[in-house]
């Protein structure tokens, strides 16, 4: 049976080991660089030093809230905003309908001046919760009628969520606001060895995917 009707011989040029070896070494080096640097890149800390406003993502653990309060006391912050979507667990047991209000109450229990605390609840959403929280903050800030010269705010969040959170809040508040960020390390693992812990690996993967989705979103 002749195969000439259906198949034709072709010559394929393949790289030799002199090509494959540098490619393999380059891949290994690039992978090593990613492993050692990606966590720090996602956990960015770049505050606006003279900002008089702070926002805390309400879902974060208490060590982040404490860090934000200490920062606010040290830097003479005028107002602390707390963001958060409606509670998705324990709403029948909790006195707080949203994470924003729960975080605000936590601040008060920690000794914060209640006159400086302003919850900024977000709408109930299934996806893009960080974006919803950023929009909730924008609505609260618009009601404050803050002078243009004072439109500087620092965002406090947990670990690897910092980079993506800052992207959302910058986009929501627009160019008239300077948005800084402070990433407080998770108490669950040491950042330098994040790949040894399931929480660290999950955080890096989740945030990497989230950033990719956000970059592709209109």
Write out the residue ranges for each language-model feature:
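Amphipathic, soluble alpha/beta structural segments
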Residues: 11-13, 85-88, 204, 212
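N-terminal type II signal-anchor transmembrane helix
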Residues: 4-45
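A structural signal for short, hydrophobic/glycine-enriched beta-strand patches
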Residues: 39-196
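A transmembrane-helix-recognition feature enriched in membrane-embedded lipid enzymes
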Residues: 195-218
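A generic structural signal for solvent-exposed, polar alpha-helical segments
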Residues: 5, 77, 200-201
């Amino acid at each position: 049976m002749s195969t000439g009707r259906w198949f034709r011989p072709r010559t394929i040029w393949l790289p030799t080991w002199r090509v494959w070896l540098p490619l393999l070494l380059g891949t290994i080096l690039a992978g090593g660089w990613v492993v050692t640097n990606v966590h720090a890149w996602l956990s960015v800390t770049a505050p606006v030093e003279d900002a008089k406003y702070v926002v805390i993502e309400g879902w974060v653990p208490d060590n982040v809230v404490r860090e934000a309060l200490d920062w606010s006391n040290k830097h003479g912050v005028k107002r602390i905003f707390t963001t958060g979507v409606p509670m998705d667990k324990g709403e029948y047991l909790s006195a707080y309908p949203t994470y924003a209000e729960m975080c605000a109450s936590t601040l008060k229990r920690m000794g914060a001046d209640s006159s400086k605390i302003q919850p900024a609840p977000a709408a109930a959403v299934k996806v893009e919760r960080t974006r919803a929280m950023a929009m909730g903050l924008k609505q609260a800030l618009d009601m404050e009628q803050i002078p243009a010269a004072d439109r500087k705010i620092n965002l406090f969040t947990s670990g690897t969520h910092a980079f993506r959170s800052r992207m959302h809040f910058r986009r929501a508040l627009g160019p008239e606001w300077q948005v800084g960020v402070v990433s407080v390390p998770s108490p669950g693992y040491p950042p330098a060895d994040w790949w040894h812990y399931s929480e660290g690996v999950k955080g890096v993967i989740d945030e990497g995917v989230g950033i990719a989705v956000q970059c592709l979103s209109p």
